[in-house]
Amino acid sequence: MNPKVLLILIDGMRPDAVLQAEHPFLREFMRTRCTYTLNGRSVMPSITLPCIMSLFHSVTPDRHGNLDNMYVRPSHRIDGLFDVLYANKKKNLFYRTWNELRDLCRPGALARDELCEWKVYGNAADIQLCDRCAQAIRAEEPDFVFYYSGNTDEVAHKHGWMGPEYMEAVSLASRNIEKLIGVLPEGYSVVITADHGGHARSHGTEMPEDMTIPIALYGPRWEKGKELETISLLDLAPTILDILGCEIPDEWDGVSLLD
């Protein structure tokens, strides 16, 4: 059976929020069924587009040139995760609640790109998108799926990190993750992460509250209940390529966590 990967990113989800959330699934899943860390390291600036560009291209923002949420085409071509997988004839699906991620890969790399915008539907966007993603995984068993949820970050900017509204959003994320894990066919590995954390109603600094993220790795090649000290956001794309049996580009800075 060919290995497959589901990457789940919950925007702005702090590790201490995972520990304190009313909905227990994500917390218990990480602790009992994953190799994980509560001390993952984001990149500076700790802002969504720079962070996710760094995740997918395994380089720091100074190399890919995106320093805020306005996309800038890199001056030097760096193949991203979607692009490398497409070149290796892998089927990529992308589910997102934020339109600004539209330039994450080159045209043609995605078999499907589904957008359900938070600014139109609110937290219902996450619920609808999760249902669509779950249906596609069951029906198609794609090689790689990226599910991006922006609800937690949007709520935090409005009401504040670690407040009751934010914690409710983290619980919703936990419920959606449980739904996605529940439909996975045999052979899937899962990577769960955040792009950054946050403090008060903002983020983007080097404060631990902004830079520290949870990361969980689930699947047949990961030890259950093993806690790692530190994982960089830059290591996730190389790890996913390694799981899927694809060569890691030389220009990437991160390393596979399977090494």
Residue ranges of predicted features:
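Feature captures the catalytic ectodomains and active-site-proximal regions of enzymes
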Residues: 1-259
